[in-house]
């Protein structure tokens, strides 16, 4: 993967002069506000900026294409003071916060400096923070909140009653469109989202060759083999996955476009994983977001719990309250069918919501489902399982003495 320039680097390259001029004016107008640690100049009455370095940028997301950001700089400042008719001078280092805004639309537009102030390191961080690459900083515990935020905007009815998400309608409300096309010869890419008009390559099965195709901004490309090889649930998840990229990751791509005009889409590959990586790239974080948030959009927390409880009661009447294995197997099956997701997705969502009993049903290992099994509810802790793949077992055998 080509190296990615940070927002800090882009701002330094594009707007150094504007930042210098605004900071210089502030320093000249406010010498008395400087935090001087000089022995020779303790109360400066004159100050001038020599140079500065950008230490970091605190970036806050905003609606639409705009962003707010604070440029934190370390400045070299020449200060002076008249003491008993003697003119004393010295140089100091002072940190400043330069608050700015800009629009991201085919590059950085409408850059403005809003204010300059002495840096206060104890200033509270804002909500909706972005990384230095303009990727939202979202913790796993916030995924449900982001899903709710998404649904409030594009499908609020799904937050008041259990229902399958009308994926096609959500796409329409977002101003996007879906095009089904085989993206690769060996089905290694299930979906793509296009952030700018461009020409892509698709695989023509009849002629057994790759061909060019012009696609417009806001197009979701989905390989129809997602449906034929898997199920409609995987298709729905793929589409909503791409919607999450559009909803949360457009600003990253606007940043990349400032120095790489060809970076116009995200490709989502089959079995892509960041599990064993020590350091994640911006693309890794974005995939992690979409992988975690999309199922929560398709199965909103409160409505999913409501549906699960309804299905448990229904199946307890059929099997009796003690036949937990059959009850949970049916609940997973019916939950997947109701929300139009895969059985694996339904099971994972139930585990995420605290229904530990489903651990023993629909367990998919080494490309096949294994037999259902039951266990005591308190015998498994977080991140523990009774089933691992053959490759994982070999890894543990060689890497872990206890195993």
Indicate where each model-derived feature is located:
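A metal-dependent hydrolase signature that marks the N-terminal structural subdomain at the beginning
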Residues: 1-197
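Divalent metal-coordination and catalytic microenvironments
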Residues: 171, 290, 346
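Active-site His/Glu-centered metal-binding helix of metallohydrolases
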Residues: 239-248, 289
């Amino acid at each position: 993967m080509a190296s990615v320039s940070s927002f800090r680097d882009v701002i330094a390259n594009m707007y150094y002069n504007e930042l210098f001029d605004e900071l210089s004016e502030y320093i000249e107008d406010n010498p008395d506000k400087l935090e001087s640690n000089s022995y020779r100049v303790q109360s400066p009455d004159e100050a001038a900026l020599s140079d500065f370095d950008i230490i970091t940028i605190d970036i806050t997301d905003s609606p639409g294409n705009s962003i707010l950001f604070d440029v934190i700089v370390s400045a070299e400042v020449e200060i002076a003071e008249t003491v008993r008719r003697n003119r004393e001078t010295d140089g100091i280092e002072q940190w400043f916060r330069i608050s700015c805004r800009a629009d991201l639309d085919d590059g950085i537009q409408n850059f403005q400096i809003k204010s300059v102030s002495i840096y206060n390191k104890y200033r509270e961080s804002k909500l909706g923070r972005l990384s230095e690459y303009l990727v939202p900083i979202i913790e796993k515990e916030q995924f449900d909140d982001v899903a709710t935020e998404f649904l409030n905007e594009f499908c609020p009815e799904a937050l008041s009653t259990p229902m399958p998400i009308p994926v096609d309608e959500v796409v329409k409300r977002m101003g996007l469109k879906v095009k089904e096309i085989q993206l690769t010869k060996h089905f290694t890419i299930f979906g793509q989202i296009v952030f700018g008009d461009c020409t892509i390559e698709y695989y023509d099965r009849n002629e057994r060759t790759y061909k060019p195709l012009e696609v417009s901004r806001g197009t979701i490309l989905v390989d129809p083999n997602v449906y034929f090889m898997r199920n409609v649930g995987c298709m729905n998840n793929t589409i909503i996955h791409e919607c999450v990229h559009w909803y949360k990751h457009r600003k990253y791509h606007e940043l990349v476009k400032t120095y790489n005009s060809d970076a116009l889409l995200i490709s989502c590959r089959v079995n892509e994983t960041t599990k064993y990586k020590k350091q994640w790239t911006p693309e890794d974080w974005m995939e992690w977001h979409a992988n975690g948030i999309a199922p929560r959009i398709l199965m909103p927390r409160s409505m999913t719990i409501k549906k699960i409880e309804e299905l448990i009661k229904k199946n307890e009447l059929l099997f009796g309250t003690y036949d937990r294995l059959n009850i949970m197997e049916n609940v997973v099956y019916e939950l997947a069918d109701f929300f139009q997701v895969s059985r694996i997705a339904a099971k994972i969502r139930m585990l995420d919501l605290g229904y530990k009993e489903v651990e023993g049903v629909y367990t998919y290992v080494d490309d096949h489902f294994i037999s259902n099994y039951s266990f005591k509810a308190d015998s498994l802790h977080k991140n523990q399982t009774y089933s691992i793949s053959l490759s994982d077992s070999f890894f543990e055998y060689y890497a872990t003495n206890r195993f």
